Structures are given as structure tokens and as C-alpha cells.
Amino acid sequence: VKAHLQKRGLEVKDCGCYSTESCDYPVFGHAAAQAVADGECEKGIVICTTGIGISISANKVKGIRCALCSDSLSAKMTRLHNNANMLAMGAGIVGTNLALDIVDTFLDTEFSGEERHQRRINLIEQ
């Protein structure tokens, strides 16, 4: 994913992890989410085995709307309707080609800006 983002000409901040050893993914999910919440990064992408734990960790940070996506339609809809600012994926769930398609869809889809969706986002953030 990192190489794919760089090929797209995007600047990447890698918050880890840097090995294939078992790690405490909440540390990395929180670091990525904090970078987005602080405005250091526009969007964030986090990955763990299922994507579940790291998405939960990211969503603990105020202002983060991290969506776990295993298909491109979910990635599109979470941007259109939820204005998600982070994407979580499971490395053990989606293959490389699908993951890259999900990433592209997530990054290339803009928030619809519809009042009903913004109203719901406001309710979530209360």
C-alpha cells in the first residue's frame, strides 16, 4: 500500500509497524489517528490482520472516523456518506489487488456534503 501511494505521488507518513513480528497494533493505530486529528495528515490508512482492532483503536481519537472496509463499495460509501478520514483494512481478509482498489476508491471519492449526512456526522461527533 505504501509503495502504491508513493506511485500515486502522495506523501506518506509511516507510523509503523516496521517488522513482521507480532506487535501491539493499538499503538500504531493511535499514532496514525493522532496524525490525522492533528492535521499533520489529510487521511490515514491502517492495517492489521482483520482490520477490526486497529479501526477500534483509531476511532478512540477525537475527530476520527475510521471505516473498516473489505470492498470498494464500502470504501466509496464511507467517503460519500460518512466523510471517513481513515481507512482500516485486514491484511488477512483482503488480497493485495483488492486492497489497492479499496485504497484508490477511498482516496478518489469525495464527501457528498449532503445536509443529512453532515447532520449525522455532527451527531456522531457529539
Report the location of each language-model feature.
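Glycine-rich phosphate/diphosphate-binding loop of Rossmann-like nucleotide-binding domains
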Residues: V1-V12
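C-terminal binding/interaction regions
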Residues: K7, S72-Q126
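A short beta-strand-loop structural module common to alpha/beta enzyme folds
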Residues: L10-C23
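Charged helix-capping and loop-helix junction motifs
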Residues: P26-H30, C69-D71
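Short, structured active-site "lid" loops
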Residues: F28-T50
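Mid-chain, well-packed structural core segment of small domains
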Residues: V46-G92
